[in-house]
Amino acid sequence: MRERFGRRCCRETIRAALHRHKLSWKKAKKLLGRADPERRQAFVEQLRDVLAGAQRDRPLVVFLDEAHIHQDADLGSGWAERGQRFWVSSRSPGLSARVSVYGVYLYNEGQVRLWPFPRANGEPTVAVLQRLRTEAPDRKLLVLWDGAPYHRAQAVREAARTLDIELMPLPGYSPDLMPVEELWRWLREDVTDHHCHASAEDLVQRG
């Protein structure tokens, strides 16, 4: 303001002016510019055919994603008295105190699963594939997921072949094509928002 217009004013004055012009303060979100448009378009066309087949009950389409949910509180906005800070109690358990959650969306069934593990890597990923096959022993399974390194690991790919599970990777930098992302948003808004969990068990039970 001072550099461009040669005037000085406090932040509250600027905020009030912006509110009058119907602007609001929002948290920024990244717009990923590294995605390949052609690969995304090809994937969307392929996905359209896959989902059309799923409506005829073949194959069982599974969207699978992972998230690391911390025991400490996720801080967001909330109501507080004017002139008072909005305090949230925390035991500061540290960033290493977390649970890795595998989120599963069964498209044909309209159902979701949340399967917690101490970490997300090759071994629990194989366990998740085995669990999916146990739930659907006689159906063709198609798993859609991102390009996480452990998704591409040889042990995971071999397990998928052994279990007769087809893998369909999403194009890079395309979280908008993963519906499980909405599950993570719900989890952080309804479970971890402004709430510090005493233990990993407490976090899992509350989720």
Predicted feature residues:
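Generic structural signal for small/hydrophobic residues in well-ordered secondary structure
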Residues: 1, 14, 65, 103-104, ...
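Conserved short alpha-helical interface segments
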Residues: 1-34, 60, 67-69
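Extended, low-complexity cationic-aromatic segments
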Residues: 5-8, 43-130
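C-terminal anion-handling pockets and recognition modules
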Residues: 13, 57-61, 181-207
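Short beta-strand segments
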Residues: 62-64, 142-145, 169-171
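RNase H-like polynucleotidyl transferase catalytic core
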Residues: 84-94, 163-182, 195-196
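Acidic/histidine-rich, metal-coordinating catalytic segments
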Residues: 139-151, 178
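Short, aromatic/basic amphipathic alpha-helical patches
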Residues: 153-162
